Design a protein with these regions (language model features):
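Catalytic and substrate-binding regions of extracellular carbohydrate-active enzymes
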Residues: 356-575, 652, 662-665
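Gram-negative bacterial Sec-dependent N-terminal signal peptides
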Residues: 2-28
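Non-catalytic terminal regions with compositionally biased, polar/charged low complexity
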Residues: 644-654, 660-746
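Cleaved targeting-peptide boundary
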Residues: 30-40
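Short, hydrophobic/aromatic-enriched beta-strand segments in well-ordered soluble domains
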Residues: 556, 613-631, 654-666
């Protein structure tokens, strides 16, 4: 998937309304070049252009954005027009030049509409006439990638992105062109580009973000060219049978809550074509009520995307790049469109964080809201986001305490996520103090770095990043979930058992079947506050049962510098063995290994001035392995990151249990340390006839227990005893606190 083009896509969408702040004749902007109904702008109407031209300069955010885009375009115009024959892969010269060109086309159309300066029309006209000469001569790209190479770019996705953006600029100048030039450009650039996309079912007729870009490009071009056939194909699929197309994608790719199947990273990427095309549909066919489809799921998706971030960065599940966040250009479009339609002032605070807007009617509304001081803080809240078109294919559980930079626990109980999905059912991540504490590797990729295979996904994305051992979840017999076959994974989703989001207690639980033949595992995690603990702690219980004895590995990938290991282990200092041969194990160095034992152990590390104590145990004897990624990596494609692996051998059932405690402060500048010692004295797990319980003992002797029933649907009473202390509760789960010295608890 090529995000480099996308970035520019929105950069120029920002340009499509970007240059409005120059001194301008509103009257001229409203009626450029004697527009006719067959050539007048349809993606942004003449009346909307007029309002931006007359009002935009009064609003600082709009004015700043216009000035930025004007400077960008003038620099490109000064450099001259360059429409090279395509020959390079991603990151190469011709690839990057064609990206700059669609930026320029979009910006030129915007500037013309907002200033009336005919230089911008002439610049875009001359560039498009060069494309009209070039495009009919192009076959498959010489560096073609994937089943369907592009024409202008090495993968067809980039051709779609080019068209989405360039057609917006063309729409703005089309009525200002001589009829002969307009016909030449229609017939030799935009129509054949759209027809090429629509003629490739392996790209066009799919339920996938690549197809979203293709149908959006085709449909927007159809509106501009007044071609209802292109519009219908884009909405209903190339055969116009409603099996594919934009409407089907809206119905299948989002859950009722607005969660996108491939995860936040690709939700970000897909939002741009979804919302830009939806806006075009609304302008041209409002009777379709596209923004009301499925109870407004497209606008829900904008809110969900912000919710699936921490301190400005998206949760990096599945194929994701760690530094993508809410300031991404795709979401700039989303925030503008969502705010214009909803008036939700929380979105203005996100726009402030983004530091920019689009020069569109929607961007103008954002600028007006910001100028009026309407921005309200965005409320990041705990929530369960259902997955699947009907909301019954698992979900993403988000537990939060302490505000935007406080504690956030993410339990990934979602669908596979198609080809970009990782094999990590019931995986989890944890954030605290503005940092990634329990981590997900994301993808193995250097976006736009030509030296790293042109910026595409590296071989290590398959051999490491997608593999189960690269995540914080159960591995059986050193194999990945579904044996590493995502198509099998698509057929099996976790079952959400329960979700609770209280003030001091937040709990998520899910069960996974069929990730391995004959294996069922259930994970229950809680974020718990207590007056004697300075910060919330994470309690984790993972229960496994199998129909035959197996090796069970449970990794914990963490971020920080190890302070202490509370267990005896053999250290490999003279040589560094590799943990295994395949399925990601070949990329792990083994640094230390304990003997098998049943007593809980501890591991502590330091991250950004805060200590983290991890106390862990299992119901069967386990080894503790300290490992680091980066083995068998001759091209240095992998980051070196530590992990702890709990290993249980030769068992049919086991329960892993742990608590992660943030605490204390280290200040190297002021040379002090506070609260370096854990406030948790003991961790125990016990089993009743139909339930399990994990008990924490604090330094004062007070206890916190979490009881979890085997059957989450039954409203019956459960009893579990821990060293003579009985805990009773009714229902799926319960938190039970007990002061120091107290007896049985209910």
């Amino acid at each position: 998937m090529k995000h480099t083009c996308l970035s520019l896509a929105l950069a120029v969408a920002t340009a499509t309304a970007t240059l409005a702040l120059l001194p301008v004749s509103a009257a001229f902007a409203a009626a450029p070049a004697a527009a006719e109904s067959s050539t007048a702008p349809v993606l942004v109407t003449a009346a909307q252009w007029q309002q931006m031209a007359s009002d935009g300069a009064r609003y600082p955010w709009f004015a700043k954005e216009q000035a930025r885009n004007k400077a960008m375009l003038e620099k490109m115009m000064k450099a001259g027009i360059d429409v090279p024959f395509p020959k390079d892969k991603g990151g190469g010269r011709t690839h990057e030049q064609h990206k700059r060109n669609y930026q320029a086309l979009l910006a030129a159309g915007t500037l013309y509409r907002l200033t009336g300066d005919s230089r911008y029309v002439d610049y875009a006209r001359r560039m498009l006439l060069e494309y009209a000469t070039l495009y009919p001569t192009l076959g498959p790209h010489p560096e073609g990638r994937g089943q369907i190479p592009g024409r202008v770019f090495w993968q067809v996705l980039n051709d779609s992105v080019w068209l989405v953006n360039a057609v917006q600029g063309y729409d703005a100048i089309r009525d200002a062109l001589p009829a002969k030039d307009r016909q030449t450009i229609d017939d030799n650039v935009f129509r054949p580009m759209a027809e090429f996309l629509a003629s490739e079912p392996k790209n066009f007729d799919q339920i996938h973000n690549h197809s979203t870009w293709a149908v959006a490009a085709t449909g927007m071009t159809g509106y501009v060219l007044r071609d209802p056939e292109l519009v219908e194909k884009s909405l209903r699929g190339s055969r116009k049978d409603d099996e594919f197309g934009f409407l089907r994608q809206v119905d299948l790719l989002f859950s009722p809550d607005g969660y996108y199947e491939e995860g936040p990273y690709y939700q970000r990427y897909a939002l741009a074509p979804f919302l830009l095309f939806a806006n075009a549909i609304e302008r041209n066919e409002p009777q379709r009520r596209i923004f009301e489809r499925r109870d407004g799921v497209l606008l829900k998706a904008v809110d969900v995307l912000v919710q699936t971030s921490y301190d400005g960065l998206f949760f990096p599940i599945n194929d994701a790049i760690l530094d993508k966040g809410v300031d991404t250009e795709e979401l700039v479009a989303g925030i503008g469109i969502a705010y214009a339609r909803s008036g939700d002032d929380r979105l203005l605070s996100v726009a402030e964080q983004q530091g920019r807007l689009l020069l569109t009617p929607e961007g103008l509304k954002v600028a007006q809201g910001l100028a009026a001081g309407k921005a309200k803080p965005f409320d990041y809240t705990p929530m369960l986001l259902r997955d699947g078109p009907d909301g019954d294919q698992g979900g993403l559980a988000i537990l939060r305490m302490g505000g935007e930079r406080g504690q956030a626990l993410v339990q990934k109980d979602t669908m596979q996520g198609m080809g970009h999905g990782h094999f990590d059912k019931l995986n989890w991540l944890f954030y605290d103090n503005g940092q990634r504490v329990v981590t997900d590797y994301g993808s193995a990729r250097f976006l736009n770095v030509e030296a790293k295979r042109g910026g595409i996904y590296l071989a290590e994305n398959r051999s490491w990043a997608k593999q189960t051992i690269a995540h914080n979840t159960l591995v059986v017999d050193e194999k990945s979930h579904f044996n590493g076959d995502w198509k099998v994974g698509e057929e099996h989703a976790p079952t959400v058992r329960f979700f609770e989001a209280g003030k001091d207690t937040q709990v998520a639980s899910a069960t996974m079947r069929d990730a391995y033949p004959g294996v069922v595992f259930t994970r229950t995690q809680a974020l718990l506050q207590h007056p004697e603990l300075g910060l919330p702690v994470v309690l984790d219980l993972l229960q496994v049962s199998a129909d035959k004895a197996a090796r069970f590995d449970l990794p914990l990938h963490f971020n920080g510098h190890i302070v202490s290991t509370g267990f005896q282990a053999e250290r490999f200092v003279d040589q560094r063995p590799v943990l295994g041969r395949e399925n990601g194990y070949q990329h792990l160095w083994l640094d230390a290994r304990s003997q098998a034992g049943s007593d809980p152990r501890t591991l502590a590390w330091l991250l950004d001035g805060r200590f983290y104590s991890y106390r862990f145990g299992s119901s069967a004897p386990s080894q503790a392995l300290l490992v680091e990624s980066g083995a068998n990596d001759p091209e240095f494609n992998l980051r070196r990151e530590p992990a702890l692996v709990q290993r249980v051998d030769g068992q049919r059932a086991v329960s892993f249990f742990s608590v992660l405690e943030p605490h204390g402060e280290y200040n190297g500048t002021a040379e002090y340390v506070h609260g370096a010692d854990s406030q948790i004295r003991d961790l125990k797990r016990a089993r009743g006839s139909d339930a399990e319980l994990v008990e924490l003992t604090l330094a004062s002797g007070a206890r916190i227990a979490l009881g979890v029933a085997d059957d989450s649907s039954a409203d019956v009473e459960h009893t579990v005893s821990v060293e003579g202390r009985s805990y009773r509760w009714r229902g799926s789960h319960a938190r039970i606190d007990r002061a120091a010295g107290k007896g049985d608890a209910r």
